[in-house]
């Protein structure tokens, strides 16, 4: 019947691999590789949260259409939360043309870039999860951002109207919007 490899043996090999003298960049690349492999085998492969990757903050690009505005007090609370609790939610992105475009989590990624607080711990990296690959393009990103913002009930009416107008100009029907 062939050799059976146990979870404990796999875990031992991974531990041995990471106990070698390798740089943080190499460790992050290996973590992302292993996570990607596990994600491909996962029964939850269609769920973006099943694969959280670490990417260089310089590869994460803010969108230019987000109608979400955060009050100073809320931003301070988010900063405190990131400092005390760490990142409990990844930045939601769309991977396009070698960049990660922010769909949700603009303020998390902004605070995660800082050289103090949580940003200092992250050493220039940000946790991201990518929206499903078929959701590529500006219209799909905008629609996803709206869904994330409206689910939280935080958005600006005028900015939301501008986005709806832009989606209509891109050929989206009222039903699709």
Predicted segments with their positions:
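Amphipathic, charge-rich alpha-helical segments that serve as recognition/docking helices
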Residues: 63-89, 109-176
């Amino acid at each position: 019947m062939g050799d059976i490899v146990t979870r404990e043996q796999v875990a031992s090999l991974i531990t041995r691999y990471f106990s070698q003298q390798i740089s943080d960049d190499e460790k992050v690349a290996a973590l992302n590789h292993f996570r990607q492999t596990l994600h491909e085998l996962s029964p939850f492969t269609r769920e973006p949260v099943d694969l959280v990757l670490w990417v260089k903050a310089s590869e994460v690009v803010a969108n230019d259409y987000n109608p979400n505005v955060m009050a100073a007090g809320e931003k301070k609370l988010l900063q405190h939360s990131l400092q005390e609790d760490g990142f409990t939610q990844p930045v939601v992105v769309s991977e396009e043309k070698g960049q990660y475009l922010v769909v949700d989590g603009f303020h998390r990624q902004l605070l995660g870039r800082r050289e103090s607080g949580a940003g200092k711990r992250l050493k220039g990296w940000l946790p991201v999860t990518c929206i499903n690959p078929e959701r590529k393009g500006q219209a799909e990103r905008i629609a996803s951002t709206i869904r994330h913002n409206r689910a939280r009930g935080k958005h600006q009416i005028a900015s939301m109207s501008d986005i709806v107008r832009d989606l209509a100009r891109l050929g989206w029907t009222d039903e699709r919007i």
